[in-house]
């Protein structure tokens, strides 16, 4: 990804945020794609499953790149990142037998903090918790987890709830701090205007 952002774009800040989110999304999805391809080479997954995973991982990234080439400060990139990764994460969570797959969401939860947008983060965080609860129920139903695994279940649940809760808290605080800074800048600008007139 390049960061050839024009400072004269309508929303320079969104363009910068998009660059960071895209780079993180590309990195995470690239690593997941490679990991699943290696699993296929080892004989641990079917070609169809691996191809589906790679398409779900890299498809939104391609969409982001296309949007970015047209306009760096488009809100579409933000939605490709959030919705695209949510679809991949849900697919992987519901089709795996691996106890640790839930951690795939952590890097992207960190990445979306760049937007400092509570309204954007809230449905993502709630979705992550719901997907994890459903996956835990599926693991019990399939016999992957039993009562003997309750410590692992509790760890997964509480880690996800804590990360999502903290991410939402950080989004709220960062958004308020940004609004305060903007209000202070506006007040200073108005004072300067008064002095000049």
Residue ranges and their predicted role:
Residues 94-99, 116-119:
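Transmembrane helix interruption/hinge and helix-loop junction motifs
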Residues 18, 22-25, 50, 155-162, ...:
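Alpha-helical transmembrane segments of integral membrane proteins
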Residues 149-161, 165-197:
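HAMP domain helices
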Residues 123-135:
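Juxtamembrane non-transmembrane "cap" segments at the membrane-aqueous interface
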Residues 74, 113, 120-125:
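Alpha-helical transmembrane segments and their helix-entry boundary regions
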């Amino acid at each position: 990804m390049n960061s050839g952002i024009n400072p004269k774009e309508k929303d320079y800040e969104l363009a910068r945020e998009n660059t960071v989110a895209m780079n993180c999304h590309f990195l995470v999805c690239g690593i997941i794609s490679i990991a699943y391809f290696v699993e296929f080479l080892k004989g641990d997954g079917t070609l169809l499953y691996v191809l589906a995973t790679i398409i779900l991982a890299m498809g939104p990234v391609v969409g982001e790149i296309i949007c970015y080439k047209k306009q760096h400060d488009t809100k579409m990139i933000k939605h490709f990142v959030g919705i695209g990764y949510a679809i991949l994460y849900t697919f992987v969570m519901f089709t795996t037998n691996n106890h640790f797959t839930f951690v795939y969401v952590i890097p992207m939860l960190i990445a979306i903090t760049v937007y400092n947008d509570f309204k954007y983060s809230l449905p993502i965080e709630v979705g992550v918790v719901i997907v994890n609860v459903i996956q835990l129920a599926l693991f019990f139903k399939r016999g992957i987890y039993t009562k003997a695994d309750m410590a692992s279940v509790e760890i997964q649940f509480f880690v996800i709830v804590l990360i999502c809760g903290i991410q939402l808290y950080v989004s709220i605080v960062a958004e308020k701090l940004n609004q305060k800074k903007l209000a202070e800048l506006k007040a200073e600008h108005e004072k300067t205007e008064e002095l000049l007139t």
